Swiss-Prot record:
Main location: virion
Classification lineage: Viruses, Riboviria, Orthornavirae, Negarnaviricota, Polyploviricotina
Protein name from the UniProt record: Nucleoprotein
Subunit structure: Homomultimerizes to form the nucleocapsid. Binds to viral genomic RNA. Interacts with glycoprotein G2. Interacts with protein Z; this interaction probably directs the encapsidated genome to budding sites. Interacts with protein L; this interaction does not interfere with Z-L interaction. Interacts with host IKBKE (via Protein kinase domain); the interaction inhibits IKBKE kinase activity.
Family: Belongs to the arenaviridae nucleocapsid protein family.
InterPro entries: Nucleocapsid_arenaviridae (IPR000229), Nucleocapsid_C_arenaviridae (IPR035084), Nucleocapsid_C_sf (IPR038115), Nucleocapsid_N_arenaviridae (IPR035083), RNaseH-like_sf (IPR012337)
Entry GO CC: helical viral capsid; host cell cytoplasm; ribonucleoprotein complex; viral nucleocapsid
Major enzyme class: hydrolase
Length: 564
């Protein structure tokens, strides 16, 4: 596709929605919870002051401080936010060609955005003092030039501040904030605002809503009168009632629709998101258009994904993030030696992040080396293979085990699994160290034979991580056989794992011939299940307590210490 060709913007948006459909959770409840808290807690006199400051053509340090202070308060109140997370993609996370493509597109995007922010037709709008701006106007007038004031109906907004980096990530709308401001400042009920924005969101599933659409919907929903009809401009804040902010809010509170706005990035799905995005890009012929101007759908998605590897790219608070996308996401094409193959697969989840240090990697490598590839090695997981929450490796011959956890990205599915299977509570694993589970799988000795009880999910998990070389032996015990020593194992070795504190509700038969019924109300722990299966194979309880190869301090992020 020639880059001068008109971009089929909405078609690209629809294609990206479909290509990333696996990561569109329903977030309406979370958005409205944050909106209610903001509406009840924020000082709307401060909001009015910030809105007034942002309407000025020339803004200074005091205006920026007001904006940053209010953003900090909103960020404190919100549960939906993006956090600082610097990500380095390496070979194994993505293929070499994908890494090069990502690096190239981020560089092009950087150039485009910097040119756009420097002003139309080369007019610099950045960190000039008021004296310099006045002097420049006089020089241009003397030389016979008309001073440019922006393209079309757009308004040039000049910030006269000492540190331009403080402007980063202070702008952009958030649905929770938009809903709260429309409710309080519009004198409306939140329910009427939600209904109106839902109508906009439904329209957005088939087209980009425009001002004519807004006028027609306003006849049905009077609260939409507060939405401004002004042209969008650079550095528009989340406190402005723009049409784009209203549409984004509407998209976020739809149930279904595969809206990009509801994407959540986690350390474990980041690489697969990038991989899927690049696949859609190639299929549709998308590209980075380096000419200054608004971002096309691919540019917008790439920028938002790469700003932080942990959070809500479109709808969360991001005002506490430092740097830009090209600062926070980088590519390293240096191939590091590995014990086992870690080839990129379709779902590409072998993400390496800054919070798994070289020292931590060395500890994990040393632990995996202690597993004997010639002896029986049990492997069990809890959670689905695409979103596992627990993994255990147990070797009876040397009494060694590796046991690690992972925070899930599908919280609804996790709660269901907790209730009917593993009994893990989110509060017990929310601080699990990202990347450990994938790194352990990647280091397993090549062509090793692994013993399992049920192999389908484990086979899929290994394939996702590029470990098709690993062989599985499924002992295929019945449910009753597998859990013969259930209670005895929990009584003897339950102290080895303290992360199954939920109540497990047995699945009951609906009919007489129902083939499935759990025979125990004990939770399923990957580690204790491995010990249990070995006991069944031995025909007696395992006697000796196994030894952990990974320290607990490596498995979880350190808790923040608070001093009064």
């Amino acid at each position: 596709m020639a880059h001068s060709k008109e971009i089929p913007s909405f078609r690209w948006t629809q294609s990206l929605r479909r290509g990333l459909s696996q990561v569109h959770p329903t977030v309406k409840t979370d958005v409205l919870k944050d909106a209610k808290l903001i509406a009840d807690s924020i000082d709307f006199n401060q909001v009015s002051q910030v809105q007034r400051a942002l309407r000025k053509n020339k803004r200074g340090e005091e205006d920026l401080n007001k904006l940053r202070d209010l953003n900090k308060e909103v960020d404190r109140l919100m549960s939906m936010k993006s956090i600082q997370k610097n990500t380095i993609f390496k070979i194994g996370d993505l293929g070499r060609d994908e890494l090069m493509e990502l690096a190239s597109d981020l560089e092009k995007l950087k150039n485009k955005i910097k040119r756009t922010e420097s002003g139309p037709q080369g007019l610099y709008m950045g960190n000039l003092s008021q004296l310099q701006l006045t002097k420049r106007s006089e020089i241009l007038k003397t030389l016979g030039f008309q001073q440019q004031r922006g393209a079309g109906n757009g308004v040039v907004r000049i910030w006269d501040v000492s540190d331009p980096s403080k402007l980063n990530n202070q702008f952009g709308s958030m649905p929770a904030l938009t809903i709260a401001c429309m409710t309080v400042q519009g004198g409306e009920t939140m329910n009427s605002v939600v209904q109106a924005l839902t109508s906009l969101g439904l329209l957005y599933t088939v087209k980009y809503p425009n001002l004519n659409d807004l006028d027609k919907l306003t006849l049905e929903h009077e609260c939409l009168q507060i939405v401004t009809k002004d042209e969008s401009s650079i550095n528009i804040s989340g406190y402005n009632f723009s049409l784009s902010a209203a549409v984004k809010a509407g998209a976020s509170i739809l149930d279904g629709g595969n809206m990009l706005e509801t994407i959540r990035v986690t350390p474990d799905n980041f690489s697969s998101l990038i991989k899927s995005t690049l696949q859609v890009k190639r299929k549709e012929g998308m590209f980075i258009d380096e000419k200054p101007g608004n971002r096309n759908p691919y540019e917008n998605l790439l920028y938002k994904l790469c700003l932080s590897g942990d959070g809500w790219p479109y709808i969360g608070s991001r005002s506490q993030i430092l740097g830009r996308s090209w600062d926070n996401t980088s590519v390293d094409l240096t191939k590091k030696p590995q014990v086992g193959p870690r080839q990129p697969e379709k779902n590409g989840q072998n993400l390496r992040l800054a919070n798994l240090t070289e020292m931590q990697e060395a500890v994990i490598k040393e632990a995996v080396k202690k597993l004997d590839p010639t002896n029986t090695l049990w492997l069990d997981i809890e959670g689905p293979p695409t979103d596992p929450v627990e993994l255990a490796l147990y070797q009876p011959a040397n009494k060694h085990y590796i046991h690690c956890f992972r925070k899930p990205h599908d919280e609804k599915g996790f709660k269901n699994g907790s209730r009917h299977s593993h009994g893990i509570l989110m509060q017990d694993i929310e601080d699990a160290m990202p990347g450990v589970l994938s790194y352990v799988i990647g280091l397993l000795p090549q062509d090793m034979v692994i013993t399992t009880q049920g192999s389908d999910d484990i086979r899929k998990l290994l394939d996702i991580h590029g470990r098709k070389d690993l062989k599985l032996v499924d002992v295929k015990l019945t449910s009753d056989q597998a859990r013969l020593y259930d209670q005895q194992i929990w009584e003897k070795f339950g102290h080895l794992c303290k992360h199954h504190n939920g109540v497990v509700v047995n699945k009951k038969k609906r009919e007489k011939d129902s083939p499935f019924k759990l025979s125990s109300g004990e939770p399923h722990c990957a580690l204790l299940d491995c010990i249990m299966y070995q006991s069944v194979m031995d025909g007696k309880m395992v006697d000796e307590e196994p030894v952990a190869l990974l320290p607990l301090s490596l498995l979880f992020l350190p808790k923040a210490a608070f001093a009064l």
